[in-house]
């Protein structure tokens, strides 16, 4: 099992991808000195008697209410309990682990004022496989992801629900079974745990990684469709793409050339009368390249956000100050999530057009619906309809979340990002995308089978062989849903990407 050491402020996308895929999480012990220094600053601020937001005052609209020193621990505990107001289905355990890892990375920067013992308690939860149950609904993405992170924090203090070794139960029971004790929160700790963009960032990162899997598999399926339709490789000539200069476009064109290199099908129709291919074949570098640039841009934003400190107020140890700001506002995450959603839509859209092309004999020159005996067999007729349905569903889901805002907290929090809403949809969109790409893979493999005596490139034949281990070639009609699910799983598991060698991605 891979272990990712969280080095606050120095994490890269590949680290978060490893955590998403199940890596063990460890906080770097070298972060302790900075954390201890910030906690000491909090202690000095309280001892000074100065009113500091969130340390010895109420929260939000109640910030003018001063809290007595003997009630500071109660203040933090009640903050957690009152803000644990989420609803809806629980987030997947992989998301919860990612949320907790992101929170460790943020707290470990030494600008939040929590004690190292509280960070160690979060680490202990992860080590013992005690994961808070976090409802998926209830955050507007400012002031941070308050409700989801309150549910995460509640498990630390023995409130709410958690899972232990996959079993859902009261958090107090989960802690007991794991041999752990509830945390007694110190000054500012509840606020530091609740305030931040870690839930929306975790959801957006997960969506990014899964859409990237769909993107890379779609390069394989798109290349296979070129061979199935006896399309041309000429539009992928590097000279075309260098004249436009977009990095993603250049990278995608190179990838398609590599995937099709050595194809016997391509060489069999050199000099044919067909002048130009339809856009869904010919313009893959332009469309998928723009998608790649968009995903890379979103990835860069999320990488920065994952390294950020996003609670409030922030603690500056060099001057012993606590300064209130607005790093909790998740607008960058909201924009990134919207970009990822757009990218998922476009990948699926161009894949669906190639499915339509391959199943239409008037355009592809292949048997109707890719069945050797049309009429008695319907072939890929309804598989295409399924792809069309999912592509349209993704279009509906892609409406930008970031353009929405609604005031909350008695108008103190009067502009919000909706980042969590925007990021939550991404995994479902990615799942839909994986199905669509899987269907195109099936169509492309079936289409190339009709070119008797000819083979595709060595790379594509290897990918096709991997697919055929899960889904045999089609003769007469058979139950289709299982084949689609198996093809989808190959996309999700990146099995075909491994066959294809190095393909361009977000990093």
From Swiss-Prot:
Its EC number(s): 4.3.1.3
Modification after translation, per record: Contains an active site 4-methylidene-imidazol-5-one (MIO), which is formed autocatalytically by cyclization and dehydration of residues Ala-Ser-Gly.
5-imidazolinone (Ala-Gly) crosslink location in chain: 142-144
UniProt catalytic activity: L-histidine = trans-urocanate + NH4(+)
Cross-referenced InterPro entries: Aromatic_Lyase, Fumarase/histidase_N, HutH, L-Aspartase-like, Phe/His_NH3-lyase_AS
The keyword Acyltransferase is annotated on this UniProt entry: no
Modified residues (2,3-didehydroalanine (Ser)): 143
GO cellular component: cytoplasm
Keyword terms: Cytoplasm, Histidine metabolism, Lyase
Highest taxon above the source species: Bacteria
Any one GO molecular function term: histidine ammonia-lyase activity
Recorded metabolic or biological pathway in which this protein acts: Amino-acid degradation; L-histidine degradation into L-glutamate; N-formimidoyl-L-glutamate from L-histidine: step 1/3
Subcellular location per the Swiss-Prot or TrEMBL entry: Cytoplasm
Gene Ontology biological-process annotations: L-histidine catabolic process to glutamate and formamide; L-histidine catabolic process to glutamate and formate
Gene3D superfamilies hit by this protein: Fumarase/aspartase (Central domain) (1.20.200.10), Fumarase/aspartase (N-terminal domain) (1.10.275.10)
Keyword NADP appears in the UniProt entry: no
PANTHER family found in the cross-reference section: HISTIDINE AMMONIA-LYASE (PTHR10362)
Entry's family note: Belongs to the PAL/histidase family.
The name this protein goes by in its record: Histidine ammonia-lyase
Species of provenance: Maricaulis maris (strain MCS10) (Caulobacter maris)
């Amino acid at each position: 099992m891979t272990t990712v050491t969280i080095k606050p402020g120095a994490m890269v996308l590949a680290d978060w991808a490893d955590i998403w895929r199940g890596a063990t999480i460890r906080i770097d012990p070298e972060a302790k000195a900075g954390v201890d220094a910030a906690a000491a600053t909090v202690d000095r601020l309280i001892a000074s008697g100065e009113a500091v937001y969130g340390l010895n005052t109420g929260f939000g609209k109640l910030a003018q209410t001063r809290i007595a020193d003997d009630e500071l621990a109660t203040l933090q505990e009640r903050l957690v309990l009152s803000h644990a107001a989420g609803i809806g289905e629980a987030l997947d355990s992989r998301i919860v682990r990612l949320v907790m890892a992101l929170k460790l990375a943020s707290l470990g920067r030494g600008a939040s004022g929590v004690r190292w013992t509280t960070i160690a308690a979060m680490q202990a939860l992860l080590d013992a496989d005690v994961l808070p149950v976090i409802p998926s609904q209830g955050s507007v993405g400012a002031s941070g992801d308050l409700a989801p992170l309150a549910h995460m924090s509640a498990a630390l203090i023995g409130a709410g629900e958690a899972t232990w070794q996959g079993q859902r139960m009261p958090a107090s029971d989960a802690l007991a079974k794991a041999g752990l004790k509830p945390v007694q929160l110190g000054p500012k700790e509840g606020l530091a745990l609740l305030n931040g963009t870690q839930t929306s960032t975790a959801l957006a990162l997960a969506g990014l990684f899964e859409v990237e899997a769909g993107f890379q598999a779609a390069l394989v399926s798109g290349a296979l469709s070129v061979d199935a339709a006896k399309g041309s490789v000429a539009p992928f000539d590097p000279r075309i793409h260098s004249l436009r200069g977009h990095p993603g476009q250049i990278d995608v064109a190179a990838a398609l050339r590599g995937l099709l290199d050595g194809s016997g099908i391509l060489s069999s129709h050199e000099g044919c009368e067909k002048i130009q291919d339809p856009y869904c074949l010919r313009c893959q570098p332009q469309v998928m390249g723009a998608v790649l640039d968009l995903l890379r841009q979103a990835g860069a934003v999320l990488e920065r956000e994952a390294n950020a400190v996003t609670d409030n107020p922030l603690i500056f140890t060099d001057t012993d100050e606590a300064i209130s700001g607005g790093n909790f506002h998740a607008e960058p995450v909201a924009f990134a999530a919207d970009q990822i959603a757009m990218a998922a839509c476009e990948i699926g859209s161009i894949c669906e057009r190639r499915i339509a092309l391959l199943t239409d004999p008037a355009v592809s020159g292949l048997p109707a619906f890719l069945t050797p005996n049309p009429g008695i067999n319907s072939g890929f007729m309804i598989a295409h309809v399924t792809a069309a349905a999912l592509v349209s569903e993704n279009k509906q889901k892609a409406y930008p979340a970031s353009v929405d805002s609604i005031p909350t907290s008695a108008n103190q929090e009067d502009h919000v990002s909706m980042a969590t809403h925007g990021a939550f949809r991404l995994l479902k969109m990615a799942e839909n995308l994986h199905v669509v790409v899987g269907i195109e893979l099936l169509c492309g493999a079936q289409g190339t089978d009709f070119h008797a005596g000819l083979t595709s490139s060595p790379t594509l034949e290897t990918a096709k062989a991997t697919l055929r281990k899960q889904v045999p070639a089609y003769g007469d009609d058979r139950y289709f849903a299982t084949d689609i699910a198996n093809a989808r799983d190959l996309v999700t598991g990146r099995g075909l990407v491994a066959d294809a060698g190095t393909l361009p991605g977000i990093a």
